Regions:
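N-terminal capping segments
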Residues: 1-55, 148-150
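Solvent-exposed, flexible loop/coil residues
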Residues: 23, 30, 66, 135, ...
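...with weaker cross-activation on analogous glycine-rich loops/strands in unrelated enzymes
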Residues: 5, 51-125
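Active-site signature of cysteine proteases
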Residues: 111-151
Length: 151
């Protein structure tokens, strides 16, 4: 997954344009521009790392967190021991509905973890308009290890 993390890191600082439009190169690539794009960012990173995600509602991966979480649960890919490159889903309100997604980078010594996320900011968890490296608490989230065999 080193290539995946390398690709995601290179995207840090990418902004939607115009601001507050949800228009990004990830949405254009995905074919669904102008809407919340955190899932499209994750799908884009996997695809450009040569590890395309399966069709999860869309032929290029996933856009919506709820659909993706249901798919990954059905596949049995939820893990409590994420490794670099795994996918994270966040449930900000702890209501069972996942609101945001990103790519797990590493555990930190204080029990937090580092992630790279699209459509976030320091003032808005899941509609912030840019790609950022974030440090998160390990609460109200699940981790997915896509067990995809590539031939």
């Amino acid at each position: 997954m080193d290539r995946l993390i390398e690709i995601a890191y290179k995207e840090i600082g990418t902004l939607e344009s115009p601001l507050n439009s949800n228009k990004t190169k990830y949405g254009k690539w995905f074919g669904f521009d102008g809407v919340a794009w955190c899932g499209m960012f994750v799908s884009w990173c996997y695809a450009f790392a040569g590890k395309p995600l399966p069709n999860i509602g869309f032929k290029k991966g996933f856009a919506g967190c709820q659909t993706a979480v249901a798919y990954f649960k059905k596949k049995g890919w939820i893990t409590t021991k994420p490794v670099s490159g795994d996918i994270i889903f966040f449930d900000w309100n702890n209501d069972g509905r996942y609101d945001h997604t990103g790519i797990f980078v590493c555990w930190n010594i204080n029990g937090t973890f580092t992630s790279i996320e699209g459509n976030t900011s320091l003032t808005n968890q899941s509609n912030g308009g840019q790609v950022m490296k974030r440090v998160r608490q390990n609460k109200n989230c699940i981790f997915v290890h896509p067990n995809i065999v590539y031939v």
